[in-house]
Structure formats: C-alpha cells, structure tokens
Amino acid sequence: LGDVYKRQAPSSILGKSHGHVPPSDRLNIAAVGIGGMGHTNINHVKATENIVALCDVDWRYAKGVFDELPNAKKYWDYRKMYDEMGKDIDAVIIATADHTHAIITADAMTMGKHVYCQKPLTHSVYESRLLTRLAASTGVVTQMGNQGSSDEGTDLVCEWIWNGEIGDVTKVECATDRPIWPQGLNVPEKEDRIPKTLNWDLFTGPAKMNPYNEIYHPWNWRGWWDYGTGALGDMACHILHQPFRALKLLYPTKVEGSSTLLLNACAPQAQHVKLTFPARENMPKVAMPEVEVHWYDGGMMPDRPKGFPEGKQLMQSGGGLTIFHGTKDTLICGCYGQNPWLLSGRVPNAPKVCRRVPKAMNGGHEMDWVRACKESPSSRVMPKSDFSEAGPMNEMVAMGVLAIRLQGLNKTLEWDGANMRFTNIGDDETLRTVIKDGFKIHNGHPSFDKTWTDPVNAKAFAEELIKHNYREGWKLPDMPR
C-alpha cells in the first residue's frame, strides 16, 4: 500500500518534508496560456512529468491541448486554479500575453511553486525587479523561456570573451528580422463581437479595458503596447542575453531610442535603441569597460563590420544577429547565440567553463528546469535563465521599450537603475504622441493629418511605464525588502 501511495500521491506532498522532489518522482505541473508557446513547453515536459491542470482564456485556441491531455483539469481563470489545486501543484508553466506574465508568475511564487515563464519575463521594469526579488526570497526554482541561454552557442560566446579572445568590448550591435506581425497600426475604429470561447476580461487582466477587436488576439497582441512589447519583447531575450551574460551587465546608465512613426497604442514598424552600461569589474583575462549596446529591428540593421566577407549575409541563423566589437577581434553570432565565429577566421580554443545543457533548443531548457525543481535546495544547481539573471536581463529589454516610448523628449535619458527612475526628466516637461496617422492620397495628392494626444506630464507618464497602475481587482504582491 505504501508503494501505491508513493506512486499516486502528489510529489509536493512526498518531497516537502525533505525540501525537494526525488528525481524518480514526477512533478505535478499546471500550465497557464497553452495555445502557443505554452503548448511547446508542455510537449517538452509531459513525457516525464504530470500535467495536472490547464488554464487559458481562449478555449478554442486551447482546444488542441485540452484534447491531448483529457485528464488535466481545465480552467479559465488562473486564480481559481491556484485556489482549488494549489496543494496538488508543484510547478507552473506560464505562456500568456506579456502583460500578464508578472502577476501570474508572482502569485505562483508566493505560493511556493516553481515557475517557468515565457519571454519576455515581464511587461515593465518594476515587474522584472519584483520577480527577481521574489525568486531570492521564496527560493523556488525559476526559468525564463529563452532557450538559447542554455544552448552551447551562448556558452562559447561567454568562454571566448572571458578568455580574452577578442579583447575588451566597447560596442555590441544586435538585430532581429521581426516583427512578422502587424505593427504601426491605428487603434481599430470598430468593436467586434467577443467570441463565446474567449473571456476578454480575463485576457485583459491588469491592463486597461479596451473594446475587443480581432486584431488583438490571438498572437497579434505583441504589437499593442497594452499587451505586448513589440519585437523587443519577442526577440531581445533571445539576442541580448549573450551580451548581458558575457559582459556581466546589470543596469544601463543612459538610454535613447528612435523609430518609424510612434503611435500611442501600437509599437512602431522599425526601431533603434542604444543602451550605455558603465564599466564593470575586470575579469582575469579581459577588462569590462563602458559599453554601448545597440538594438535594431523591423529591417533596420547595423553597418557591415570592416573586413566582413563580401557576398555573405550579415544576419544569419534564426533571423537574429549579434556583433561584439573587441579591441583584438570581432565576434559574430546568430539568434540564440548560435554559430559564433570570429571575423579574423581564428577558431578559439578557450577553456570550457560553462555547464552544458544537452538538447537545449529541443526541450533541454525546460528539462533543465525540471531537474533543478527536483534537487535538494542545499545542493541545487539553478537552470541557465533563472530569475537572478533573467530578471535584470529583462529590465534591459523593458528599458528599450521605455527609450522608444519616450523618444519625443528628444534627449538621451539618464537612468538610476537601483531606484528605477530617470534623473533628467523635469517636473514640468510634457510629451505628446500620435494617436492616429491620417495620411491619405486624394486625386493624386498626399495629405498629412496626424491626431495627437494632449500634452501629458512626461515624468508621470514615464513612472507609469516603469511601474504600471493595475486595473481594479488585480494586484501584485508587495516588493520584498
């Protein structure tokens, strides 16, 4: 009877007295947001773990996963799932729209549940800082879903730079071929009927309530500021993590952004961001001077480095690019840090100091999180993108969004990272943003008719972007001291 109980009882019951779940036991995992990347994450763990609960605000979009896992209990509202099944859940996978990542993740962590949250980790700087501190205070195992951080390409980039192979790095340029969804759009003028299979109130969550339009969901929410973070949120966690880790970055001190037409509700079609990071503590074989990190998307690209092979495409594997400009050489890699190479043609033989994760891009990233969940806290090896690193790295992404949305101030913004505030936005400065682009051609003649917001206090506007004011009924846990 005891053996039968051990096979059937929740692993949270079996492991808590020992502080861990034995590797032979299966985690009881709940998933929130299962129709897109959540489905992929579930597929990578379901063979070895128990998927006990599934939650989604759109049951038509989620139907395929519901059908694949008929024994899992189904929910619309993650809060009800946590209330009813909290004692039976060990860990949660979260793959909802960006604007709900933080609250769903934070609530799970405060319940003592391990969490795997898709990228971008959060929608704002404050939310990232909160999850970083909650990870430290709760001790749960955390992982952001940027699988390239576990891939060997990222390991090689770090090892080459730390071994001094390219010298000191003072400039990094990163680019993506995204967005591949609509951006630069006016707010829809018509309201569509909400499908019976979609709970629009729950999708909206802590954001302001907008009239439903089919342009927002599914997937295209990425381009709308209330729900997504544009191409930065979609791809920067894959492409900026290599410079963040390899160069030991933390908070930038200066940010600036520019873009195609900036609208108040929708991300621009293309953008450029520059973040300046102060000098860090030198490593044994390489210095860590002040460094500029540049981001390009929407077709914008950095210049081809001097000596780059003619006829060779600058952006390579995965639709992403990173160029590390060193004093001795130039290191170039694709999306996720894959296929790194040196412009000189040398092939470094640097010591392999980074832990390798097998099959990182094909489930290894998720299973490395599962491994850590089952280990004893006293000897646990955290996964490669746990929130102690993913949280500050995601702040870098959120800072890029801030730089774009505040570009109308027409200056380099100075950032106090420790206190999460800009130091050079005056109390009386104002900002206007375009609401609607009314460009038309009539009888062969163009007409330009932009509708602008009224001037708003720039400091208050920035503060709301840094720390969102949640809709009534939605509240984050308090920031741990």
Give each language-model segment a name.
Residues L1-Y5:
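Short, small-residue-biased leader/transition segments that mark boundaries at the very start
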Residues R7-L69, G148-D151, P243:
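N-terminal Rossmann-like dinucleotide-binding module
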Residues A31, I94, C117, T142-M144, ...:
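Hydrophobic residues in well-ordered beta-strands that form the structural core
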Residues A47-T48, C55, W59-A62, M235, ...:
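Glycine-enriched catalytic-core subsegment of oxygenase/oxidase enzymes
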Residues A72-L130:
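Beta-loop-alpha module in the N-terminal Rossmann-like domain of NAD(P)-dependent dehydrogenases
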Residues H114-Y116, T122-L198:
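A contiguous active-site-proximal alpha/beta segment in oxidoreductase catalytic domains
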Residues D151-C174, N186-E189, T204, G233-T260, ...:
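Oxidoreductase and adenylate-handling cofactor-binding alpha/beta cores
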Residues E173-E214, G426, T430-I466:
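Core domains of carbohydrate- and sulfate-ester-processing enzymes
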